[in-house]
Amino acid sequence: MIIVKLFTCLLMVSSVLTLNDVRYKYYKTEKVGNKCRYNMFSYLENDESIYEDRLCKMYTCHIMEDDALMQHSMCKLPKGFREGCTVESKTGRFPYCCLNRKMSCPPEERNDDFNVVSVKGPKFPRNKSNDKFKNLSVKNCPCLE
């Protein structure tokens, strides 16, 4: 009985350690003067570095929490655009992604099991509240350099 309890305890500890070792990134943005400040976190960790995008002058930002573990940054875009999200690009920049019905996901970023699509970062399961994420593109975004 004691051996079973010890084994169960070890399993629980190892699962917690595994959870904390996840290396996905996600981004938080906030309005700072006429700029958007990007806070980059390792997913489930707290190593933070700050990036500023000088081109983000028109956005007011807020944080959307899908659940306790996943946070996603949302900003209001200028007229003619839908909501957008920040993703990590393959070039290492942190572009602003624009959501627009005319845009579609680049093939390498598609994941048919999820609506939110990014090169790296959290992906949210498909449900009605996430329908707006069906057409996500990193192309033709106003904040890209």
From Swiss-Prot:
A GO term from the CC aspect: extracellular region
Localization terms from the record: Secreted
Secreted in keyword set: yes
Superkingdom assignment: Eukaryota
Keyword Hydrolase recorded: no
Post-translational modification: Contains 5 disulfide bonds.
Predominant localisation class: secreted
Keywords: Disulfide bond, Secreted, Signal
Signal peptide from the UniProt entry: 1-18
Tissue expression pattern: Expressed by the venom gland.
Protein name as it appears in the record: Venom protein 30.1
Organism: Lychas mucronatus
